Amino acid sequence: MNGTEGPNFYIPMSNITGVVRSPFEYPQYYLAEPWAYTILAAYMFTLILLGFPVNFLTLYVTIEHKKLRTPLNYILLNLAVANLFMVFGGFTTTVYTSMHGYFVFGETGCNLEGYFATLGGEISLWSLVVLAIERWVVVCKPMSNFRFGENHAIMGLAFTWIMANSCAMPPLFGWSRYIPEGMQCSCGVDYYTLKPEVNNESFVIYMFIVHFSVPLTIISFCYGRLVCTVKEAAAQQQESETTQRAEREVTRMVVIMVIAFLVCWVPYASVAWYIFTHQGSTFGPVFMTVPSFFAKSSAIYNPLIYICLNSQFRNCMITTLFCGKNPFQEEEGASTTASKTEASSVSSVSPA
């Protein structure tokens, strides 16, 4: 074995020299230089400085403005809540542990940090699944008399939390486990060992099939059909120009969210799967650390995409920040008509 396995950790370094120590008790500076841990702490602190305000603002603005409380926005709010879970449950602890060079909060802290990080990522993924299905229903009209309303949005929210917890909770109750990963300053699911005592192999396979491959397949199907339908509608001019423009705006926003999610999480998932399927292979701590911490940046991009691409939300946000006034009203005015149409039409379907 090219690593050292303990009762509750796995370190990607052989202990032939005797320098390997528990990541819960000793600084791990034999894995990387102290300055690397300082950079890690600074990076995570930056994510907190950006992630908390932008996600909190998303929640506050939506609650403040009644016209933003549409079924579609319920799911987008769910993304903001998931991101705040990651910020408070994962980022803050990682800043502190990186400054010390090891996971100072012990096994219990590792379980909590791993749970919140996994929960936030899974809520985001399943929220994107619900958004993809919503876009498919609204634009492709597979059920001509179906109307996507508040009750469907609430059921979608419940679904995302149930699925996310079905992935994040088992390691807390003996099916797999959370352990320090990479440079040993943050925790995640154990991809490094088979650990038959906790049936680790079966959980990792379950996680990759049910909580990664299945949602990506659903998203791919929905947007594959979506692209075809949008092209056909544009060619036949079945909808009014204003409605088409509003639907395109929302669809583009959701598609970009999905692409950004894949850019952030696919490298992490790919590296994790490689490590799991190549047990005993040699890899350095940075090999897992870089994609892991790159994936954490996902807590920032969704609200930024929403703010940049949704003109109605952007106008409400500016109004909130400037105490009821919008100094950029003339610039925002050009898209007001499309925004109003979007609020009333993108989450409903009239008979085909």
Curated annotation (Swiss-Prot):
GO molecular function: G protein-coupled receptor activity; photoreceptor activity
Membrane-spanning intervals of the chain: 37-61, 74-98, 114-133, 153-176, 203-230, 253-276, 285-309
Record's keyword annotation contains Phosphoprotein: yes
Domain of life where this protein originates: Eukaryota
Expressing tissues: Rod shaped photoreceptor cells which mediates vision in dim light.
Pfam families recorded: 7tm_1, Rhodopsin_N
Entries under InterPro entries matching the protein: GPCR_opsins (IPR050125), GPCR_Rhodpsn (IPR000276), GPCR_Rhodpsn_7TM (IPR017452), Opsin (IPR001760), Retinal_BS (IPR027430), Rhodopsin (IPR000732), Rhodopsin_N (IPR019477)
Modified residues (N6-(retinylidene)lysine): 296
Modification(s) after translation: Phosphorylated on some or all of the serine and threonine residues present in the C-terminal region.
Extracellular side: 1-36, 99-113, 177-202, 277-284
Start-end of Low complexity biased regions: 334-352
Predominant location: membrane
Record topological domains on the Cytoplasmic side: 62-73, 134-152, 231-252, 310-352
Lipid-modified residues, S-palmitoyl cysteine kind: 323
The keyword Cell cycle belongs to this UniProt entry's keyword annotation: no
Disordered: annotated span: 333-352
Positions bearing carbohydrate: 2, 15, 200
Entry protein name: Rhodopsin, deep-sea form
Lineage: Eukaryota, Metazoa, Chordata, Craniata, Vertebrata
